[in-house]
Amino acid sequence: STPIKSSAASDVYKRQDMMNSEIGFGRRILQAFEDNGISFEHVPSGIDTMTVFVHQDEFMDKEQNVVAAIHRLAKPDMIDIEGDLALIAVVGRGMRSTRGTAGRIFSALAHANINVKMIDQGSSELNIIIGVSDGDFENAIRAIYNMFVLVQL
């Protein structure tokens, strides 16, 4: 079976045109969290975006300090903060050699009417991290479990 873990979180989403070509942008963003004593849970990024997932309870009291530090250190075009998120890690050694695993996960979530807010799969293909609303967490776990454990395709 595939182990499933989660973590309640807030995400801090930053956007800056051509962020990927600016040396040190990611380090400066993470510096703002480090300077405020906040560790990050997950950091997916794209060409123009970077999202930092942190534990909501660690972040709430320091939000304004972190946002001010990000503006000062990295000067992003935009910062957006969303709370009450849950991260689910679908993990398994067999994922790398099994076709359709991601499709089965997202089909199960769609059939359960769960909106996926974030997807990240590393090149190792050993896990897929999925972000959903905290209120959808239990139903998401149930849908994924049912797809992989109860339904044998």
Regions found by a protein language model. Give the residues of each.
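Single conserved hydrophobic/aromatic residue that forms the stacking wall/gate
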Residues: 1-13
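A conserved regulatory-domain signal marking ACT and ACT-like small-molecule sensing domains
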Residues: 10-153
